Amino acid sequence: KPNYEPGTRIYAKVTVFGEGPYGTLAEDLIHRFRLREGRNPQSYALGVKEVIRVKHGGSPGLAVHTLGYPLSARVFGGGFCYGLAENLYAVGMVCGLDWDDPQMDVQELLQRFKKHPFVQQFIKGGEVIAYGAKTLPEGGYFSVPRPYVDGALLVGDSAGFLNVPYLKGIHYAMKSGMLAAETVFDALVQGDASATVLSSYEDKLASSYVMRDLYRVRNFRQAFTYGRLPGLLLGGFTMWTGLGPTKPGGVREDYTHLRPLNEAASTRRTREPAQYDAGVLVDKLTDVFYSGTQHREDQPPHIRILNPARCLTDCIARYGDAPCTHFCPAKVYDLVGEGEHRRIQVNFANCVHCKTCVIKDPIDVLDADHVQNIDWRAPAEGGPRYQGL
């Protein structure tokens, strides 16, 4: 563009990366310096959330968490309903991204969840006024990368500090930020920001409640790989006794769990189409509108498909569908055209910056190099406008 100005270069002796789950720069750092070597790959979940305004009085302080419905027994996740101030409710659905169904759609599952009589008693007759989506790091203790390297530290969700069974992580982000600040201060006083000096950050984390808490529940999420009932039994046993594996292993990248449509075990409850209305049950594009997301159409797309041909020859041919058109909670990806002219159309302006696509994309373009066929980079400008989320 004629008025284009390159971004400002900012130099620092130490940079603290706190970009949230699957941060663009944080993941580059992790892969470039092999910070996850000898540890499990990170496991993620996708959460979608709506704020609903009702006509009757609300239930401030209400907090409901559910497990399962409308998910199959092979999918880890559930819903929630929070009563906010006045006549507002926050309703959402969270699903582990290690599902095997190529047609699974979490936004659609949220609509089905809202149809349940238990949820309807709170939101019936209401209207959606806000929407958002985000991934969560669920891998736990064994998936935490080495959190330091020359001139850099990782904090919060970028490092994977989330306690899955307790649904807590904000206090870990705050504590890791405090410990990172202490480490940076010491490094600046010494005039040495090398990995040798910054390694004290990992020691501080190990002696804090952050890693102690995560170690206690280190095997909880992995137990649900076997299904909901075995997961509850094994996960609960390991969490309350502290027993179970003490070393990393047995965990695969989320995208490797996808299976052909006719082989997926989690399809039994994910085939029924959702029903929509003009208020509380909305389709995906309507939710995108309520997210407030905006991107200038004349900027370079921040989402690219590196090898579009492989979408047809590898992805659709193997899975019987285009998984990205389902797992994206913002309808960024559309399968258009017929026959040999079919292609994936990228509507980058819809993006709500959840990062699901780069985690769940089943095509690894260079075979296990952690470079997926979908490339997501921070846009020049724009994004969702979270309101009350």
Predicted regions and their residues:
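Active-site-proximal substrate-binding core of FAD-dependent oxidoreductases
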Residues: 160-166, 178-230, 340-347, 370, ...
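Short Cys/His-rich Zn2+-coordinating modules
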Residues: 302-313, 337-343
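Predominantly flavin-linked oxidoreductase catalytic cores and closely associated redox partners
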Residues: 1-124, 179, 183
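Flavin (FAD/FMN) cofactor-binding core of flavoprotein oxidoreductases
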Residues: 65, 121-142
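FAD-binding beta-loop-beta segment adjacent to the flavin cofactor pocket
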Residues: 133-164, 287-300, 310-327, 334
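Iron-sulfur cluster-binding cysteine motifs and their immediate structural context
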Residues: 318-349, 355-381, 386
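C-terminal catalytic lobe of FAD-dependent flavoproteins
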Residues: 92, 97-126, 142-175, 181-187, ...
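C-terminal auxiliary extensions adjacent to catalytic cores
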Residues: 224-279
